[in-house]
């Protein structure tokens, strides 16, 4: 009898442990909303985001309040998964610290976007991109994201629709400098540092030309910050988790605090410097 009771108690404990391990549905629902795997690269995440966003963009759904709300929620999703530090924190804790996206909203968003995703094809994306780049709508989104990320352009490019740092950096700089001079947005040290670097590089001859399709994630990882982030997370996840855990503990006391742009870039350099020697040692 005692054994049966113990077995039953053990079963109950196992059930509780299993439920705890399952965690809240929100733990993986950010990825489910976009219809990507948890280990998806940043390129895959951005592609899924762009595909959904072009259908929900306010300019294409001016009379649809529901579409506008979902577009805003979609932007919050990409603001987490498209940001190196926020994604690392989310992967570790499952927490998003955003009261504007309640847990039960993820299931609704996931189902809605899953249906929406099927309705979008490559032709839709190309048509949207051709009309969007260089438009007033693009400028409006640029200024909104500039304010949101406080001039941190690396993060802005991760969320900006149809953007390419190689093609758009000079163009965006001109637009932002004009907006800053007109008092539409406020400059920041992070932006000024980025703008100085861009000023020293040669602008593209045709920035609004049709963007080339990217053929290889390996090649993109050398030029696209978002892909570099994803690649490092996959290859050195343990080290990334450890590094960002220390950042989280440092800034965790203040919900508004976050690493500076210098710390953000220094963290990236540390990971790269640790990864390169390991490749050499393998070759020996």
Curated annotation (Swiss-Prot):
Tissue: Highly expressed in leaves, flowers and siliques, and to lower extent in roots.
Subcellular compartments: Nucleus
Feature: compositional bias, Acidic residues: 255-265
SUPFAM superfamilies, A to Z: Chaperone J-domain (SSF46565)
Keyword terms of this UniProt record: Chaperone, Nucleus
Composition bias type Basic and acidic residues, residue spans: 266-275
Region (Disordered): 1-30, 196-221, 252-284
Any single GO CC term annotated in Swiss-Prot or TrEMBL for this entry: nucleus
Domain J: 29-94
Residue window of motif Nuclear localization signal: 3-6, 209-215
Role this protein plays: Plays a continuous role in plant development probably in the structural organization of compartments.
Record family assignment: Belongs to the DnaJ family. C/III subfamily.
Name of the protein this chain belongs to: Chaperone protein dnaJ 6
């Amino acid at each position: 009898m005692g054994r049966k009771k113990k077995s039953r108690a053990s079963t109950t404990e196992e059930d509780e442990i299993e439920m705890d391990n399952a965690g809240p549905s929100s733990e993986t629902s950010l990825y489910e909303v976009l219809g990507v795997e948890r280990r998806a690269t940043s390129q895959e995440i951005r592609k899924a985001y762009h595909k959904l966003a072009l259908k929900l963009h306010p300019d294409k759904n001016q009379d649809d309040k529901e579409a506008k709300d979902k577009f805003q929620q979609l932007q919050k999703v990409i603001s987490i998964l498209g940001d190196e530090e926020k994604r690392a924190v989310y992967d570790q804790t499952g927490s998003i610290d955003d009261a504007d996206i309640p847990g039960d909203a993820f299931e609704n968003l996931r189902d809605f976007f899953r249906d929406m995703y099927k309705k979008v094809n490559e032709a839709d994306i190309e048509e949207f991109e051709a009309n969007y780049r260089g438009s007033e709508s693009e400028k409006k989104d640029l200024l909104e994201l500039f304010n949101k990320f406080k001039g941190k352009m690396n993060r802005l490019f991760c969320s900006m629709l149809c953007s390419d740092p190689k093609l758009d950096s000079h163009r965006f700089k001109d637009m932002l400098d004009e907006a800053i001079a007109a008092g539409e947005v406020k400059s920041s040290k992070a932006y000024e540092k980025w703008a100085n670097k861009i000023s020293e590089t040669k602008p593209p001859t045709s920035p609004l030309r049709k963007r080339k399709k990217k053929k290889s994630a390996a090649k993109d990882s050398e030029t696209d910050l978002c892909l570099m982030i994803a690649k490092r997370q996959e290859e050195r996840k343990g080290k990334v988790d450890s590094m960002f855990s220390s950042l989280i503990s440092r800034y965790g006391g203040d919900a508004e605090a976050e690493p500076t742009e210098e710390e953000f870039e220094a963290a990236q350099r540390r990971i790269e410097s640790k990864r390169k020697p390991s490749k050499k040692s393998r070759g020996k």
